[in-house]
Amino acid sequence: MQKKDILFSIGWPLSSLYAGIMKLRCLLYRRGLFRQHHFPVPVISVGNLTMGGTGKTPVTHYIAKLLLEHGLQPAIISRGYSGKSGGEVNIVSDGQRILLSAEQAGDEPYMLASMLAGVIVITGKKRYLSCKYAVEKMQAEVIILDDGFQHLAVARNLDLVLFDAQTGMGNNRVFPGGDLREARFALDRADAFLITGKCPREEEELLAIELELQHELPQCPLFSVYRTEGVFYSAKQEKVVTHLPKKVFAFCGIANPERFHHDLEKQGFSLVGFKAFSDHQQYTGQCIEEIVKEAKKGGAQAIITTDKDLVKIDSFATELPLYSARPRTTISTDFDELILKTCASFGE
């Protein structure tokens, strides 16, 4: 039995209590007893029902890039997990310059800011204050609420809920006895579902989670998010490259390390070693030295990590070439239209 399963078994008696508290919280927002903040621009929430990684960051990146390409000024609003900036509103990027470090901003907001020139990125515990600042002070035209499904203090015009293709709804129990942040009734708030981590060859194949969602909420559109082979970023050369040595050592500190491992194997890399750290891992010089030592011992010709990890370690020198993997994200037909239609119809 895995450690997670043991913890879920211990926490199972409290699941009903936690689910009840979350349901009451939702009801209080719905009845207006808890204030929900509305804004004069479209708000798109990207979130999930389950704990762990479902690919929210790539989808957030995709939406922001799409909006920018259509002449709209997006602002990504994040809680800023693991970031050390303690202000109510922390401007990671004003769209022109990156103003905070990865340590201050948190790894995911910093990564989004570094990869999305022209996009505003703000963090803060009270996200409605960040939304207010983005609209009033920075002229944001669309708000993208990162990890926003449970953040009911901000009203939204489109609620996107993501599920991992392999793990689905986990064990179908609510925390602390399972993977769910809320009971399944919460899916009634969703406007669309995205199934992440599918292979393009599975496009016509309906997975168990898709059949489940279509049965329970047939009125809700369902989209597939594909991760296909992309490019790699060289930390030393500071540019994108397409060819790497095949004998590599890989490491990451993300919520779903198995997916990263699988992606590398699928691309034909021979992994001499793989090390998975906890999500939002803070790396030290000693930690990087140990990674390099292990990689050299295995005969690796290069080290590969994720963009999320690279932004936290680019100040450390490594004896072996260091790269980050950048898979391409594509989303099934009509998703772009849904996003743009939501923005175009706002206020009608």
From Swiss-Prot:
One of its GO terms (cellular component) is plasma membrane. It is an enzyme of class 2 (transferase). Keywords: ATP-binding, Kinase, Lipid A biosynthesis, Lipid biosynthesis, Lipid metabolism, Nucleotide-binding, Transferase. Transmembrane segments: none annotated. It catalyses: a lipid A disaccharide + ATP = a lipid IVA + ADP + H(+). InterPro entries: LpxK, P-loop_NTPase. This is Tetraacyldisaccharide 4'-kinase. It comes from Desulfotalea psychrophila (strain LSv54 / DSM 12343). The gene is lpxK.
